[in-house]
Amino acid sequence: MISRHFTVLTALNLQTKIKICIRNFSIRGAMTKVNGNSNGNGISASTDLLDTPSAYTQKSNKTHTSIDLRSDTVTVPSVEMRRAMAEAIVGDDVYGEDTTTNRLEQRCAELFGKEAGLFVTSGTMGNLLAIMAHCQRGEEIIVGRYNHIHRWEQGNYAQFAGISATTLEVKPDGTMDLNDIEQAIRVKDCHMPASKLICIENTHNYTGGKALPIEWMRSVKQLAERRDLKVHMDGARIYNAAVASNCSVSKIASFADTVQMCFSKGLGAPVGSIVVGPKDFIDRARHSRKALGGGWRQSGILAAAAHIALDHADATIRADHERAKTLARMINDATPEEFRTKVFAAEKDITNMVLVHCQNGVTVQQLTDFFQKHDILAMTFDARRIRMVLNWNVSDENLETIVEVYKKFLKQL
């Protein structure tokens, strides 16, 4: 009896030591990656620190005069939006009687070249509903490990839908290797979950708002069709992708079976996202939306603002892109030669995001803290990068202010 207990305790101790060794190895590996070099134009493992505080939950000392670059979600509704919201014709959307919402869903379906649409509370809900409508419990999605669906949506597909994920590396342009995708598709075997869905993200947030290459998206869609899988696009910023790719949103959407787009990001509406796809898919998503608490009533008040956002979408997004390119260039022009290996803004393939890289003795915390002391809010994106997202509440005059504060930061180093 004593021998059996001793054997069990020895095994438990060995198991604990193995866990500690694995954890220490992981930490050492992460530290090694942190000391590696970044290519400056996208992501690398060196930026991926799991213990970096989440900038998505950090509160700021925002005032009414702040220049807020943390996200394009921080905008406030325009006067035109507020008027449309106040005057919206509404009904009970659960009964299908909110005409403003119905018009928005139909408008978006036509805009994206799909059969039907569903207005939902958020992009996170929209992506989850899409996954649930494509997959049964016990099935699997294929998704990039840096994609918003996997990294910043709490693994909700597992929490609420019992769906697993195979995650793949993401390249600096936001794509995944096509061979990796194909190899991740499961063979039909009773020991394995069935692969059902490939999830892509356009534009790709973590790589700095990169617009996915058209030919890559076409290849992913062809691969999915050949292997009997579907493609869902997290198109939270699909309008940014369309402007950057110089094409229509319907062309971008044609490379996916289903798409989710946020109204509350670059388009500037206060709340809501749209999911579009085949009618039977939308019917399933609408059914699941109720279970998630998303069956709203007079949603037309919010849909009215989304209509206004769509009316001005192209002009709004183009202005953001131009300001982002200008800001990145101004930051680099303002950086003296001796600091250019320490602080720089990535200028390649910019949409509405500017990523400022801090290294070689300059930390992201130093720069974000200095900005905040001067009423400028930027996001600590990860261990080496600050994200500044241009939005319609940021003016050309604001860019001058940002760069002047940046110059002061460099002088006190």
Curated annotation (Swiss-Prot):
Belongs to the threonine aldolase family. Its cofactor is pyridoxal 5'-phosphate. This is Uncharacterized protein R102.4. InterPro entries: ArAA_b-elim_lyase/Thr_aldolase (IPR001597), Low_specificity_L-TA-like (IPR023603), PyrdxlP-dep_Trfase (IPR015424), PyrdxlP-dep_Trfase_major (IPR015421), PyrdxlP-dep_Trfase_small (IPR015422). Keywords: Lyase, Pyridoxal phosphate. GO terms for biological process: glycine biosynthetic process; threonine catabolic process. One of its GO terms (molecular function) is L-allo-threonine aldolase activity. It comes from the Eukaryota. GO terms for cellular component: cytosol.
